[in-house]
Amino acid sequence: SVPEYRNEPEYRMFDRIIRGCMEKEKEARYQSADELQETLQELQNQLKEQAAESRIVVFAGAAAGIGTTHAALGMSHFLTRNGCPALYQEAYDTSAVRTLAKNMGIKTDRTGVYRIGCGSIRPYYGEAVKLPYLYFPVIIKDVGVIRPEEKLPEADFYVLVCGGKWWEIDRTVNAAKILKSRGNVILLFNHMEKKARLKLPKVLSDIHYFFLPFFSNPFREDKAANTCYRDLWNDGTGETRWKRKKLSQRLRRSDAE
């Protein structure tokens, strides 16, 4: 049988380079050392990207209908618009993204990703599906409603989308405890205004939290939401100041579409 690694893009590219050097016909070989060097440099850049680790941020919901997917999509688009390409990834068995794409008349590209505006969205495929490697500086994993019996992916930090009203606090506390046992967790209160009075129990007193203002479309820029996402990102990564990176023309054009 053919070794699995031979199906990887970098192996196929290396194989083409070798065959291009050994072709019997002169016209089929590389025409100059510069052409060969350029192709080898492209392969080297691809391998460097794969060696770089993506920063993983997991979004989880304390309850159904709290807005986890909306919040996660908003975060991925905020980062991408500001020069840090982020992949939104459905990390639990759901058809939400496919339903959204169907309603918008959008199909996946060859890597299994939907492109909406400047954003990249990968639906849930399950562990059995082998997809092409994609490098993104940040991957936003949406795990849906958090459940004690389910295994959570590793992450640089976790974001718990939750409610702070009196009937929601118990679920928020229980979900926060689960995430706190896994690593750094931040509470993101949805459907609540900043001025709302919030009294957290002592068990959550050391956990940082933010309020996500209402915004109807996660694919559109919203100034108030941007401020929340910026502060959330800085807190989760330990950065003290957000620096907006220069966007490429490609991203600018995509966001305008």
Task: Report each predicted region and the residues it spans.
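NTP-binding/hydrolysis catalytic cores, primarily Walker-type P-loop NTPases
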Residues: 49-52, 220-257
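Residue-level marker for well-ordered alpha-helical positions
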Residues: 15-16, 73, 173
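P-loop/Walker-type NTP enzyme "switch/lid" segment
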Residues: 55-65, 85-154, 209-210, 216-223
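Conserved catalytic-core segment of NTP-binding enzymes
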Residues: 134-225
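Walker A (P-loop) phosphate-binding motif
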Residues: 50-82
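C-terminal lobe helix-coil module of Hanks-type protein kinase domains
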Residues: 1-44
